[in-house]
């Protein structure tokens, strides 16, 4: 692993279904009630805030997307979480994650090679080092390197949006993510 981005230690993620379910349960109990208010927030020194941090478990099959959405719906129906928290979570899973997953299965493998805007610039070195005067980019890159995690706002609105506006080749962005 020596030449790869980031470090293997400390390692804090679940590797079994039971541990992934326990991590999701902890999110539901502790963070979901505030998720709706803070789902798009970034705060220095708080890499996870009120996020579920379950994409990796969904992606490798340790958690099922429909099952986690139904669990959140149950929490809302029972009055344990506000509507904005339940709606925000379910929308991100079904309305975004599953939509993008569907595009992947529909359009691959050619989709990976697409470059609609014809962007050709190389990915800047600061995506690997975090050495930039842009505080949000620096924080998102450093957090990704340190925790192997960045929430959707950091990926979409910080590192992704910078790459789009700067004309970075999407293949380089894909390889970085």
Q: Predicted segment positions?
A:
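Catalytic cores of enzymes that engage adenine nucleotides and/or redox cofactors via long glycine-rich
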Residues: 1-148, 165, 172-177
């Amino acid at each position: 692993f020596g030449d790869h981005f980031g470090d293997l230690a400390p390692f804090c993620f679940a590797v079994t279904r039971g541990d992934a379910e326990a991590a999701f349960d902890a999110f539901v109990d502790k963070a979901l009630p505030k998720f709706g208010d803070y789902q798009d927030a970034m705060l220095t020194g708080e890499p996870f805030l009120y996020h579920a941090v379950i994409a990796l478990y969904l992606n490798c099959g340790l958690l099922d997307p429909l099952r986690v959405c139904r669990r959140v719906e149950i929490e809302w129906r029972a009055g344990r979480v506000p509507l904005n928290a339940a709606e925000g979570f379910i929308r991100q899973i079904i309305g975004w994650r599953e939509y993008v997953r569907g595009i992947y299965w529909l359009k691959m493998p050619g989709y990976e090679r697409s470059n609609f805007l014809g962007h050709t610039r190389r990915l800047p070195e600061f995506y690997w080092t975090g050495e930039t005067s842009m505080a949000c980019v620096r924080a998102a890159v450093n957090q990704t390197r340190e925790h192997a995690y960045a929430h959707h706002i950091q990926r979409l609105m910080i590192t992704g949006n910078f790459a789009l506006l700067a004309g970075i080749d999407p293949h380089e962005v894909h390889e970085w993510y």
